[in-house]
Amino acid sequence: LILCYLVINMSNILIIKHGSLGDITQASGAIQDISENHKNDQIYLLTTKPYFDLFKKNPFIYEVILDKRLPRYNLIYLYFLMRELKKYNFSKVFDLQNSSRTNFYKSILFPKADKKVWSSSNTTLPLDKNKEEFDKISVLERFDHQLNESGLNTSNTLKPDFGWASTDISEIKNFYKIDKYILLFPFCSPHLTIKKWPHYNKLIDLILNRYGDEYKIITVPGPSEINDAKDINALAILDNGRSLDISQLTSMIKNSSFVIANDTGPAHIAAHVGVKGVTLFGKHTTAYKVSIERDNFKAIQVNDLNNLSAEKVFEKLSSSLS
């Protein structure tokens, strides 16, 4: 009888989170809080192909739904996606993407819904701020405000733990004979070269001069970064000639002695798995706005990354390892 009662009273809850990798990492605490506030409900997550299999590992999600994110004018795709979502009869939606696209989904699925049914930064906007002002607040504080305004108790949103994404990498570590290592992420998207610090090889020289072979110096290039990795004087870690998947990448980061990264997805992973490290920020944004600084993971913020010396970065590393 109790089981029947629970089944009858179980609701379906939808979370929307499309990407990018840094965004996915940051949302881990919010997803955990949503789940813990809905212990008797089933949590579904709508995401994109790069994160579909990854989210199947998340212990706080019951089922993952794929959104191919085809153009909005593809009415046939849109029709079938909306039909798919409607069949779950979701009682509440948490929009953690907060994009124009997900706002468009709301206009189809729940056009008149308030924050009790559709939780987003728009429906939970503070009375004294417009959206532009609200978006200047750090991303984790925005999530926290959104969930609090939606009636949730939040104990994880401000301190996400991405550890759930990790996997066994003993075979990779054995293949490359690595134990203690310093992990570098000198890469960035081709259209975001403003995020790229140019002095990694000089930093590597400083590390080798101080520590010799105490630490291996490695990189973990993504699919489009394998060629670029050849320009860095570090061991590039691959899995049978291919880039590591997100779970393998997470474990490599989590097991490292120290991480040095440009402002990229792997830097956000490092921040939210508790590893020691530093990320390098130019004037493109602030470390505060993207919520990347943690107890062990810090940012160096400068106006021009070209003028940030390898010595300054090495100083952060050596003081942390000593």
State what each model feature region is.
Residues 10-21, 184:
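Nucleotide-activated donor-dependent transferases that construct or modify glycoconjugates
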Residues 16-27, 54, 189-198:
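A short, glycine/small-residue-rich beta-strand->loop->alpha-helix junction that serves as a flexible
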Residues 24-36, 50-53, 203:
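Short amphipathic alpha-helix
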Residues 44-74, 234-238:
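Conserved nucleotide-sugar phosphate-binding/catalytic loop shared by glycosyltransferases and other
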Residues 65-162, 181-186, 190, 284-287, ...:
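Conserved nucleotide-diphosphate donor binding/catalytic pocket of glycan-assembly enzymes
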Residues 120-121, 239, 268-322:
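Nucleotide-sugar donor-binding patch of glycosyltransferase catalytic domains
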Residues 161-227:
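Active-site donor-nucleotide binding/catalytic segment of nucleotide-sugar enzymes
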Residues 199-278, 282-285:
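Donor-binding and catalytic core of enzymes assembling or modifying cell-surface/extracellular glycoconjugates
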